[in-house]
Amino acid sequence: MKILGIETSCDETSAAVLSNGSVCSNIVSSQLCHTSFGGVVPELASREHERLIVSIVDSALSEANITKNDLDVIAATAGPGLIGAVMVGLCFGQAMAYALAIPFVPVNHIEAHIFSAFIQETPHHQAPEGDFISLTVSGGHTLLSHVHKDFTYEVIGRTLDDAAGEAFDKTGKMLGLPYPAGPVIDRLAKNGDPFFHEFPRALTAHSQTSKNYRGNSDFSFSGLKTSVLTFLKKQSPEFIEKHLPDIAASVQKAIVSVLVEKTVSAALAGNVKAISIAGGVSANSALRTSMKKACEQHGIAFHVPNAEYSTDNAAMIATLAGLLLAHDLVPRNRYNIAPFASFAAGRRKASLT
């Protein structure tokens, strides 16, 4: 089965081709036009997707050495994301599938991230064995989910304010770093002292997401942002410049330690033997190293996507579509799917909480 995946939920225009579960191409174009604004401008993102979508899809087909007539299925992100951006890829994918008279599969962007850790591990659309805890962490989302082997899942934790990636970007902006600041902080931190300054770690006392789950798995990063701002206001520009790697390392430690502690605690509380991380922040080297070490200490299997599948990409869209089709979990031949803005609105199962 040959699947074309399309992803346009934010500021990456991506198309990928999978053949029997193997990635044949994964073309990603990141929009640089937002850099001067310090964040993504929705209108600009939509226009860039519209400008690039045809050439990106053509490149994906060409690299996979196939034509559009060789495709069996087309899948595209239907949300959550910037509605205008989502609509570009969704409408393009639906129209293309309709014209080719082949099935179209709408994909939940966050669900695709959840399963992106298994792109290189599950050829031929084999589902992961057993349950796992998934940490999906990016600039827009910080979610902890208990994923069951039948593809149902419960969201057991989420951020109560800022997402982890947003915390990286906002503290980076305070430090005068370019957008997106997460990768820059990661690089600076390699030469810094993570114990230079003890920024607060928010370990919220009571869960507001899943009252039935044992333990609290919610996150909060707004206090960290305020603490960094207060700390920097007390320092001279010379001090900040001299200790920039140390401050970056200290900020990173505060964010990563909470992510690791909450995720591992959730696995232990639920007696789950596997953990996966996904989303743009999963590319952070400290998060990968710390989570792997913690999993090894507790005998928990650790799954993480290759670097190219951590950020938004169409390979994960096509991969999840293949998994869902193989297990007969999605309707086929629907060409009138509307985009959705929230994670909850796009869940596949009504029983999910």
Curated annotation (Swiss-Prot):
Any one GO molecular-function label of the UniProt entry: N(6)-L-threonylcarbamoyladenine synthase activity
GO cellular component annotations of the record: cytoplasm
CDD domains, sorted: ASKHA_NBD_TsaD_bac
EC numbers, comma separated: 2.3.1.234
Cofactor dependence: Fe(2+)
SUPFAM superfamilies: Actin-like ATPase domain
Known role: Required for the formation of a threonylcarbamoyl group on adenosine at position 37 (t(6)A37) in tRNAs that read codons beginning with adenine. Is involved in the transfer of the threonylcarbamoyl moiety of threonylcarbamoyl-AMP (TC-AMP) to the N6 group of A37, together with TsaE and TsaB. TsaD likely plays a direct catalytic role in this reaction.
Record's protein name: tRNA N6-adenosine threonylcarbamoyltransferase
Lineage of the organism: Bacteria, Pseudomonadati, Chlorobiota, Chlorobiia, Chlorobiales
Gene: tsaD
